[in-house]
Amino acid sequence: MLLAFDTATPFVTVALYDADDDGVVAERRSEQRMRHGEQLAPLIEQVLTDGGIVRQDLTALAVGVGPGPFTGLRVGLVTARTLAFVLEIPVYGVCSLDVVALEAALGSSPVGRDFVVATDARRKEVYLASYDDQGRRLDGPDVVRPAEAATDAPVAGEGAVLYPDAFPDGRSPVLPSAAWLARAVAGELAELHDPEPMYLRRPDAAAPGAPKRVL
């Protein structure tokens, strides 16, 4: 059994995947924005209960590595590393934009051509990457202002919802799905990473540095 979760967006998504049956056993998403630290553990327990298993039945973990806000990413990655250590099972990281791309390309409403994934990077910017019609990444991810990346190509992800003038051809999904994160790992459909955060810029909250010298 593979447990997958992503905390790179304002919502937490968790899924349980049975590789033997090639199917999603259970999936849940948080109902409230943010509060990742309060919501992730209960969602994991709910998914395990839905699947009728306990943690010791897990054989692997999958976690979204971003890019995304520092606080949310840290919650998911620390949880993944801790569980993997305690249970002595492997943990695989996947770029959260790749997860969105796989569902856009291979899900129930496939884009059918090259497309872009744009997610909210705050500060009126987006995380952006381009993909082929099978969801394979061609370029990126980068952090850019929407106006600088405006395109008529299909755009999956929350960026198309937030900036429709720059990305008028919005496609689903808007957010990454833990079910597709699990499929990405189980089927080796995306590049696998260590469970370390994918940052494209410094976190908003940074430790103060040494005082600057003054003449």
Label each PLM-derived region with a short phrase.
Residues H36-G51, L97:
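Short, well-ordered amphipathic alpha-helical segments that serve as non-catalytic structural scaffolds
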Residues R29-Q32, I44, P67:
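Short, well-ordered turn and helix-capping elements at secondary-structure junctions
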Residues I44-A60, S108, A150-A153:
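Phosphate/pyrophosphate-binding loops at sites that engage ATP/ADP/AMP, CoA/4′-phosphopantetheine
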Residues A60-P90, S96:
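DPxDG-like acidic metal-binding loop motif
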Residues E38, P42-E45, L77, R81, ...:
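N-terminal, well-ordered alpha-helical segments
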